[in-house]
Amino acid sequence: MSTILHITASIRGDESISRALSSKLVERLSGTDTKVITRDLSQNDIPYVDADRFAANLSPYTERSPEQQELAAIADTLIEELQAADTIVLGVPIYNFSVPATVKAWADTVARAGTTFEYTPTGPKGKLDGKKAYITVASGGTPVGSEVDFMSPWLKFFLGFLGISEVEVVATADGIMGEGGEEKIASAHKQVEQVAA
């Protein structure tokens, strides 16, 4: 049985293009015995990391206080989702040239030294190798892959930092708010079909 972790982040719900693309990709990648774990970051259920959560996340499980166990519970769950997945599909919009704040909160939460990456004499090394990730990107005005797109390269780098180096991006071209928006969305859907052919 294979496992797909489907992460979405758009606040636009059913109107979201990035969510529609990622959902289509998950559907096409899924087989009869595929387990799909869904995590909707737009629900704002991931708190931002503060000093107490940071300390709890770094504490060995057996040494955590009851308060630390509670603070670290969401991080444990999110990390377990990543560890269990063979494939990660992220549907992420570009907001103000970068990732939604909830995606950054997710990243800060799952980046745990000794668990998802480790420090070595030659530098940090990811511990989640052997997985493949797909990022479906939608942008209203920021051209995906341009010098003002700080989302796509950052997210690819972060996944690589965790050891997920095989990352494929499917994106709407040049922003969809201007002329030809519907054609750009249709083209992105065709990309999904080709990726999962």
UniProtKB/Swiss-Prot annotation:
Top EC class for this record: oxidoreductase
GO molecular function: electron transfer activity; FMN binding; oxidoreductase activity, acting on NAD(P)H as acceptor; oxidoreductase activity, acting on NAD(P)H, quinone or similar compound as acceptor
Highest taxon of source: Bacteria
Signal peptide (from-to): none
Requisite cofactors: FMN
Free-text cofactor note: Binds 1 FMN per subunit.
Binding site for FMN: S10, S16, I17, S18
EC number, as in UniProt: 1.6.5.-, 1.7.1.17
Record keywords, A-Z: Flavoprotein, FMN, NAD, Oxidoreductase
Reactions performed catalytically: 2 a quinone + NADH + H(+) = 2 a 1,4-benzosemiquinone + NAD(+); N,N-dimethyl-1,4-phenylenediamine + anthranilate + 2 NAD(+) = 2-(4-dimethylaminophenyl)diazenylbenzoate + 2 NADH + 2 H(+)
Family membership: Belongs to the azoreductase type 1 family.
Function: Quinone reductase that provides resistance to thiol-specific stress caused by electrophilic quinones. Also exhibits azoreductase activity. Catalyzes the reductive cleavage of the azo bond in aromatic azo compounds to the corresponding amines.
Quaternary organization: Homodimer.
Name of this protein: FMN-dependent NADH:quinone oxidoreductase
Organism the protein comes from: Erythrobacter litoralis (strain HTCC2594)
Gene that this sequence comes from: azoR
